[in-house]
Amino acid sequence: MNEKIRNFESNQMKKDIPPLHPGDVVEISLWIIEGNKKRFQIFEGMIIAIKNRGLNSAFTVRKISSGEGVERVFQIHSPVIKEINIKKIGVVRRAKLYYLRNLKGKSARIKTRLHVN
């Protein structure tokens, strides 16, 4: 029984996911369905947390929009995600960057290395 579940989950997992790390600035293309129209929308921000749980793996992305912090949790293997692009690689020493919620302006920046696809 356990082997059947493991095989099913491995078949459902996406294979083309780039390696994600906290502090990375990513651009996520999402499929949005409105009525009978299907389009994609881009959400760009910094990864502040990753939860590795096999098929249920998720990551939290934070961005500042109109002066307000917006956080969104994405399932890594979700069919809603069209693609994930890494814009910058962050250099951090923490697994969870929740402290960024309390920082504003230049103090909320982290060191980055430029990433070229």
Curated annotation (Swiss-Prot):
Taxonomy of the source species: Bacteria, Pseudomonadati, Pseudomonadota, Gammaproteobacteria, Enterobacterales
Its recorded name reads: Large ribosomal subunit protein bL19
What SUPFAM superfamilies is this protein classified in?
Translation proteins SH3-like domain
List all membrane-crossing ranges: none
* NCBIfam families for the chain: rplS_bact
What is this protein's function?
This protein is located at the 30S-50S ribosomal subunit interface and may play a role in the structure and function of the aminoacyl-tRNA binding site.
- Asked if the record carries the keyword Ribonucleoprotein, the reply is yes
Q: Does the keyword Ribosomal protein apply?
A: yes
Single GO biological process annotation from the record: translation
Q: Name one GO cellular component term.
A: cytosolic large ribosomal subunit
One Gene Ontology molecular-function label = structural constituent of ribosome
Organism annotation: Blochmanniella floridana
Supply the alphabetized keyword list. Ribonucleoprotein, Ribosomal protein
As for family, the record states: Belongs to the bacterial ribosomal protein bL19 family.
Q: Which domain of life is it from?
A: Bacteria
